[in-house]
């Protein structure tokens, strides 16, 4: 284990850290003594800031100063155990304050609260989560899974095996929290269990427990039972930049669910172009990652293909580089694929072309010239014809999705303009491509 350096661990008590899905924002609880309340614990946040770039162009980072969450901290209360939602818009935490619920003896209990991020990036007033999450017992240590709808927390309410137990609560499609469920034995015991976190793929959980056989408070793990699993999600992450290596001003990045056309905007870090987002897999839809910027080329790729079993690992997207399409240079849109030795466009490629057609119809001054290329496998004349048929198939698809035919042209260049020597399967895959040239129409 390595202790974090400044601004952490500067002599006071720290704990309960929660980090954003892009790893650039961290929330933590720390002792913040006041004259009236020396043991006061408050919530703080810090950002992972770009300090400089080295000689190779790599970014150097540093955690910024801890900033107290003034709207959430109370002078005479206790705020700790933060849990940031995967979209960065909600912050859950535990607190004992003047508005807390009271038990049968009239004592204030530990409760779970939630704050919404405002448009200016600050945190709004905290709200006490409703029953069945909070009770007149002590409820603490919230963990909201990246699916955004599954909350795990610790409580000493009944029924209980004794001490604090881990509980599960799911939010339905209407936003209502369903009945909370105790995870039961052997996860919960007559000791204390709390601090549970669940992996993004929902398969494994980690928690702290003080039970028979442990040496005090120890860390344990277990496979998540089916009835307590969160919804299926994956993390999509990468970087976006222009060809000059800078961050395109006004660049837009979003997820589009192919069937419902639902759009989810992804925030791009202005310093280094990094991004990360959660993609829902339970919708039964293909999902596109689309990037646009004024004056720069459209790009899209399929990050969820419903005909393939989603991998458990995160989806690390190759760096997105937006080219300048109006300087006479051709550009590629990733994942435009065809059946072998055919002009039949692949299923997911059709989805990408539909999104590209939408982009062109929104930008009426733009035309597009489509260029087909092949590798050198087969006869040169056959490759020439195949490239023409593939380019025409793409042109037809764009027209079918509403782009006026007058704004579309196409040609095939066969194997005449390879990007790499045709020496192996990898180089040939580079040469089999469809390029696009954007033109300005009068």
Regions found by a protein language model. Give the residues of each.
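Structural recognition of the beta-strand scaffold that forms the well-ordered cores
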Residues: 83, 197, 337, 344, ...
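Loop/turn elements at helix/coil->beta-strand transitions in domains of secreted/extracellular proteins
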Residues: 24, 89, 149, 363-367, ...
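Periplasmic OmpA-like peptidoglycan-binding domain that tethers envelope proteins to the cell wall
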Residues: 155, 160, 371-442
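Periplasmic peptidoglycan-binding/tethering modules of Gram-negative envelope proteins
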Residues: 227-367, 440-442
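Solvent-exposed, polar/charged alpha-helical surfaces in well-ordered, non-transmembrane soluble domains
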Residues: 6, 21-24, 67, 86-89, ...
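Extracytoplasmic
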Residues: 21, 109, 333, 365, ...
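Short, conserved micro-motifs composed of acidic
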Residues: 1-239, 243-249, 265, 269, ...
């Amino acid at each position: 284990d390595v202790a974090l350096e400044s601004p952490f661990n500067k002599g006071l008590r720290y704990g309960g850290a929660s980090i954003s899905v892009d790893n650039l924002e961290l929330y933590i609880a720390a002792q913040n003594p006041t004259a009236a309340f020396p043991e006061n614990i408050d919530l703080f946040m810090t950002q992972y800031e770009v300090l400089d770039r080295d000689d190779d162009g790599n970014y150097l980072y540093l955690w910024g100063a801890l900033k107290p969450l003034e709207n959430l901290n109370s002078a005479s209360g206790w705020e700790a155990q933060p849990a940031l939602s995967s979209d960065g818009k909600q912050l859950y935490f535990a607190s004992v304050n003047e508005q807390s619920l009271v038990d049968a003896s009239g004592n204030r209990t530990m409760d779970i609260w939630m704050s919404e991020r405002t448009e200016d990036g600050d945190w709004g007033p905290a709200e006490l989560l409703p029953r069945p999450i909070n009770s007149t017992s002590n409820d603490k240590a919230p963990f909201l899974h990246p699916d955004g709808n599954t909350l795990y927390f610790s409580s000493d309410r009944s029924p209980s095996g004794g001490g604090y137990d881990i509980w599960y609560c799911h939010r339905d499609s209407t936003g209502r929290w369903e009945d909370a469920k105790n995870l039961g034995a052997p996860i919960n015991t007559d000791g204390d269990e709390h601090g549970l976190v669940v992996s993004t793929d929902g398969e494994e959980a980690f928690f702290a427990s003080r039970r028979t056989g442990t040496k005090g408070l120890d860390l344990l793990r277990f496979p998540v039972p089916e009835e307590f699993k969160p919804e299926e999600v994956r993390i999509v992450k990468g970087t976006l930049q222009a060809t000059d290596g800078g961050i395109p001003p006004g660049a837009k990045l979003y997820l589009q669910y192919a069937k419902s056309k639902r759009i989810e905007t992804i925030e791009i870090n202005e310093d280094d172009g990094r991004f990360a987002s959660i993609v829902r897999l339970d919708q039964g839809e293909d999902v596109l990652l689309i990037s646009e910027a004024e004056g720069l080329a459209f790009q899209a790729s399929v990050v969820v293909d419903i005909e393939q079993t989603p991998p458990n690992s995160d989806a690390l997207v190759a760096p997105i580089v937006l080219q300048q399409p109006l300087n006479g240079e051709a550009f590629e849109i990733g994942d435009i694929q065809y059946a072998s030795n055919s002009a039949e466009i692949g299923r997911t490629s059709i989805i990408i072309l539909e999104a590209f057609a939408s982009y062109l119809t929104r930008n009426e001054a733009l035309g597009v010239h489509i260029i087909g290329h092949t590798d050198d496998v087969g006869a040169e004349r056959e490759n020439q014809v195949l490239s023409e048929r593939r380019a025409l198939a793409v042109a037809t698809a764009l027209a079918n999705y509403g782009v006026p035919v007058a704004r579309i042209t196409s040609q095939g260049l066969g194997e005449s303009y390879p990007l790499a020597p045709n020496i192996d399967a990898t180089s040939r895959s580079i040469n089999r491509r469809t390029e696009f040239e954007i033109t300005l129409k009068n």
